[in-house]
Amino acid sequence: MSPLEQFRVTKLLDIPALWGIDLSFTNCSLVMVLASVSSILLLCWALRKINVVPGPSQTAVELIYGFVANTLESNAGAEGLRYIPLVMTTFLFVLACNLVGILPFGFTATSHLSVTLALSLVVCTAITVIGFRHQGLHFLRIFLPEGTPLWLAPMMVFIKLFAYVARPVSLAIRLAANMIAGHTIIAVIADFVLKMHLVLAPLPFAFIMGLIAFEIFVAILQAYIFTVLTTVYLSDAVAGH
């Protein structure tokens, strides 16, 4: 079987198209729903009883909250803390989707550019709205840094505008590419192990376990990077330059 077969999107529930848009419920849709629901349920379970001396589950949630709050404050200042719900939701969703894909028979929704691009566009659109809300039309100053010579202004505006539009694209490609690469390598080596003689199998099998552990690290790292970049972009909207 092709190592790319694991990324195939299959229809689970066929829904008639609306205005030419396929609304069918797929395995990708199912994973995103499961990732969202599982994140909510785990948070509710971890915080079902808040103690002064936190237990392991409460400590884990507090660590995630602390990471989001500290990252926001360091990049966007105290004003950025009001957007903790946006950033924390983004982090948990990306992390859950990444980790679900590592489970046996799992499907990695974040390996598809359509998913990561949609998520990136939602985040960047929200940041743009926040920017205009905080700064009004002064938000447009991010495209023309103060002190730019007049003769250089048109080129600077073009470069800054291109970089701004490229933000969601770079976020999406980075996340999808890393998820595809890791899962493909694991699939190739796993197929190699299955076709090997039993005596030789333990070594590559141990290597696969190491790769899976590394893939878990990558899944967490990519959610971390996505979140940090979101807070960096949010700093332009909240505080400007």
UniProtKB/Swiss-Prot annotation:
One of its GO terms (molecular function) is proton-transporting ATP synthase activity, rotational mechanism. It is a multi-pass membrane protein. Keywords: ATP synthesis, Cell inner membrane, Cell membrane, CF(0), Hydrogen ion transport, Ion transport, Membrane, Transmembrane, Transmembrane helix, Transport. It holds the Pfam family ATP-synt_A. GO terms for cellular component: plasma membrane; proton-transporting ATP synthase complex. The chain crosses the membrane at residues 27-47, 52-72, 87-107, 112-132, 142-162, 175-195, 198-218. It comes from the Bacteria. Belongs to the ATPase A chain family. F-type ATPases have 2 components, CF(1) - the catalytic core - and CF(0) - the membrane proton channel. CF(1) has five subunits: alpha(3), beta(3), gamma(1), delta(1), epsilon(1). CF(0) has three main subunits: a(1), b(2) and c(9-12). The alpha and beta chains form an alternating ring which encloses part of the gamma chain. CF(1) is attached to CF(0) by a central stalk formed by the gamma and epsilon chains, while a peripheral stalk is formed by the delta and b chains. This is ATP synthase subunit a. It comes from Anaplasma marginale (strain St. Maries).
